[in-house]
């Protein structure tokens, strides 16, 4: 399979991953920790039914099982392609490029965008501004920008591993991945957890042509296998959570992640063969502005939830109609707003376009 076809498959995976982020962020009504958070369930009047909310929240849970491992695997596969093409001449230039593309946006958008919007939404309550900034930068508070920090560290480590990559590497990496479930500091646990997926993506690229050719001969069979495995593992993940064993939960989640990524790749590879799919204006827009959409979209959810509470009330937000309305509004508004914010950022600061594209 030629390089252009590889790029098509990976490009479509990137589009799918961005859309999964938007979808998975449109359902939560409760999120946070000791440094701040939102809990619109607690504001609901006594007797309010949470049935529909919990059903929709299970969809979010299932997407979370694989969509961020998918993001990391795509990055690993693309890095393996770059290594094949001899793009990077040394670690210094590589580290500097990753710092500029990942860590500077992480710092800038956390300080100047994420925290101010969370304050506006009431997320931080009585937490002072310095504590709020510190908790987000150190990942002590939940921040969707953890991905930028994690990818930066993972990429630096993978720079030395990918050129020497062998299949047996996955075993110790999986061990590190499991141990991360017991590490309480996100600054350390997240790179430990996601290095496995980055390397798995790089490993997949080494065998991709052979595997893809084989998948094509039995496409329906593999689709059935991956779909069945994903459904079973997702249900099992929901079940084992009651035991409170982090390693067991991580193991089952890993199986679901692999099945979800396999299923998504088959879908992307099929779409890559559809003439004109990548040329559609929608797909091009998501591809070009994907990083910015990721950066700008999620904090807007907190603001929309506060507006929803003011207009519908907690009980109204939790009714079936309220849930559907809020999800549609959150998906459309955050997606469109993030897209136009990305374009505005590029127009105002063209020399910093790589921060969001």
Residue spans for each PLM region:
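Membrane-cytosol interface segments of multi-pass membrane proteins
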Residues: 1-175, 311-357
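Membrane-interface junctions at the ends of membrane-embedded or membrane-associated helices
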Residues: 3-4, 83-89, 163-167, 205-219, ...
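Aromatic-anchored segments of alpha-helical transmembrane domains
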Residues: 19, 23-26, 172-186, 225-239, ...
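Hydrophobic residues within membrane-embedded alpha-helical segments of Major Facilitator Superfamily
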Residues: 20, 70-72, 197, 204, ...
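Interfacial loop-to-helix transition and helix-capping segments at the boundaries
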Residues: 56-69, 136-149, 181-200, 235-263, ...
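Hydrophobic transmembrane alpha-helices
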Residues: 77-81, 154, 158-162, 194-210, ...
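Solvent-exposed interhelical
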Residues: 152-175, 183, 203-223
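Alpha-helical transmembrane segments of multi-pass integral membrane proteins
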Residues: 246-349
């Amino acid at each position: 399979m030629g390089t252009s076809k590889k790029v098509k498959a990976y490009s479509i995976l990137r589009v799918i991953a961005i859309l999964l982020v938007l979808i998975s962020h449109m359902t939560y009504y409760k999120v946070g920790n000791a440094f701040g958070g939102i809990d619109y369930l607690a504001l609901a009047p006594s007797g309010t039914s949470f049935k529909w909310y919990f059903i929709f929240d299970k969809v979010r849970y299932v997407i979370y099982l694989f969509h961020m491992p998918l993001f990391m695997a795509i990055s690993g596969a693309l890095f393996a392609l770059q290594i094949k093409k001899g793009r990077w001449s040394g670690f210094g230039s590589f580290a500097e490029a990753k710092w500029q593309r990942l860590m500077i946006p992480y710092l800038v958008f956390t300080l100047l965008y994420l925290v101010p919007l969370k304050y506006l939404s009431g997320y931080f309550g009585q937490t002072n501004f310095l504590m709020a900034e510190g908790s987000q930068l150190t990942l002590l508070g939940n921040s969707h920008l953890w991905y930028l920090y994690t990818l930066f560290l993972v990429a630096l480590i993978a720079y030395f591993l990918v050129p020497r990559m062998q299949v047996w590497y996955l075993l110790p990496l999986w061990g590190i991945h499991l141990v991360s479930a017991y590490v309480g500091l996100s600054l350390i646990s997240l790179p430990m957890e996601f290095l496995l997926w980055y390397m798995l993506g790089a490993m997949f690229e080494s065998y991709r042509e052979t595997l893809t050719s084989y998948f094509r001969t039995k496409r329906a069979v593999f689709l059935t296998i991956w779909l069945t495995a994903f459904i079973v593992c997702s249900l099992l993940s929901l079940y084992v959570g009651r035991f409170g064993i982090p390693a067991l939960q991580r193991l089952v989640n890993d199986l679901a992640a692999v099945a979800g990524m396999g299923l998504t790749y088959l879908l992307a590879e099929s779409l890559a063969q559809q003439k004109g799919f990548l040329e559609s204006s929608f797909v091009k827009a998501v591809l070009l502005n994907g990083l910015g959409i990721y950066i700008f979209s999620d904090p807007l959810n907190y603001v929309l939830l506060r507006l929803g509470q003011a207009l519908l009330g907690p009980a109204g937000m939790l009714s079936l109609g309220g849930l559907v309305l809020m999800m549609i509004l959150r998906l459309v508004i955050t997606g469109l707003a993030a897209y136009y914010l990305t374009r505005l950022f590029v127009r105002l600061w063209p020399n910093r376009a790589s921060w969001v594209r």
